[in-house]
Amino acid sequence: MSAVSPFKLPRKTPFGFGEKVIEKVSGLSKLDAIYEKYAFSDDSFEFANEVLVQLNTRYEIERGSIGDIPKKGPLVVVANHPLGGLEGVILAALIGKVRQDVKVLANEMLSRIPQLARLFIGVDVFETKSSRSTNTRAVKEAHRHLSEGGVLIVFPAGEVSSWQSGQNQITDKDWSKSIGGFVRRSQAQVLPLFIDGVNSRLFYQAGRVHPLLRTLLLPRELINKSGKTITVSLGDVIEAKELNKLDNDKCIADYLRLNTYLLNSSRNGDSTSINGDENRNYYATPVMDAVDKALLAKEVEELNDDDLLLSQGDLEVYCVSSNRIPNSLMEIGRVRELCFRAVGEGSGNASDTDEYDRSYLQLFVWQKQKHDIVGAYRLGITKELIQQSGIEGLYSRSLFNYDSAFLNSMDDSIEVGRSVVAPAYQRQLQPLLLLWKGIAHFVAKNPKYTHLFGPVSISNDYSPVARQLIASVMTVTHYDNEKAKLVQPTTPLAPSNNTFWQSDMLSSLGDVGLFSKVLSRLEKGPGIPILLKQYLGLNGKLVCFNVDPAFNDALDGLIVVNLAQVDKRTLGKYMGKENAQRYIQRHQH
């Protein structure tokens, strides 16, 4: 036991009166009583566990398990900082169950406790004359520890969570970019952890008066957690090579913070897929039976050679007006409804066909041996549709409010949508590729068309918070702000209480691969929707988001692709090298 308690202030006032008052108000005196009463172990990890017992505070793992913690090699553990001191003890106890080579970079006040001195690397959070040298030594020690293959626990905010007026919530302030330096230099794995905790109202009110008052009350916040259970969520380990794709240390800090806070969103009510039992009545009407294959084959056989866009093995790609293939259109509608229901969308009808199908072209992939509709797309020639039915003849106009100004911004355009691949062929890459090749070959035959546009769906298989995140990231990184001024949603996406992120935190997610990893971790499965990814690969830009009540509240993004600005190599992948060369030369200005 230390001769001088770490919870007693140096006596500078007469009889120590002032210090005693501060100790009582702040809660230091109660911590001192606990510290003096019990014979704590000198072992740092045992001490951490004993402190939790004496404070009558528990922690439980709500997501992940200690088995997810890498057992060797340099590891940086990043966490939010909601409580101010207790989380350091909790994480030391938690990580200590798996690794003994642990250091915690935290407030130096904790490192003054003898039993924690060997475990904590103290940082001076006050801007004093000595803080620069103290913190420089701390950073060097942290780097050295990682270079030796150890675990470093860091709270990158550097101070306890507080009211952030810009975000209108209690949360961490911006994370220090120094966390990026630790990761980049050590090439360590990173384990994000989210700690679900909150301090008293008095604590936050005091902080709004002056940060020092908040600091003064931190010991009291340790004590008032008695009888409470703090939940901890462990994320998936993030490899250094993933973080190496980010531009700088600030981007790394933002990326890690996003992945950490998403652990909270992933376990609350906003995380569940919309596609659930509540939608069973929506699908009360069964999907129609498959159309007789003989009828389909007869229709395809009667098509002209000019209707065939391309063929590959037993697969052929056609594009024809709907009135020429009534049976095939019924089968396409059946396949649409079957597939869209599987991801929480669908019209709820026996077949997904509508009044727009009659005036649109149907592009489809045909399996000539099995007589199957493999996949399909719907194409609308914008000017022709407007001539026939006005602007309301465009399907996208039922979802988004726009006028001729938006359409004129795209020159000659084709509205595309209702993309689908039949269930039996969804594990193959070829069908979707052939659909895109079909569109490209159609454009090559009709090279005046420069733009594709239409709704791309984010299905209800994605949780609400994932849908919000997709919309937010796309708005920051893949958005045409000028065209967006010309479009309004008919049913806007409602804001969520879980949109903790700010736009600058999302700016590094323009890399589709990185963002897909974030989504995959959040959803424990799918990354970016495959069709959206395809559009982005063609430099597609979103201009608006809308919820479609007639399609089981699917979230649609209105996307625009300028084919004339797609690079020749990418365009050649779909259109063919020579076709792409001619097309690009035609549209060069």
What does each model-identified segment do?
Residues 2, 136-288, 501-509:
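Non-catalytic C-terminal accessory region of glycerolipid acyltransferases
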Residues 103-134, 139, 146:
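Conserved nucleotide-cofactor-binding alpha/beta core module
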Residues 281-323:
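Conserved N-terminal entry element of GNAT/NAT acetyltransferase domains
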Residues 337, 347-350, 384-541, 546-556, ...:
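Acyl-donor binding region in acyl/amide transferases
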Residues 99-106, 360, 366-392:
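Carboxylate/His-rich catalytic cores and anion/metal-binding grooves
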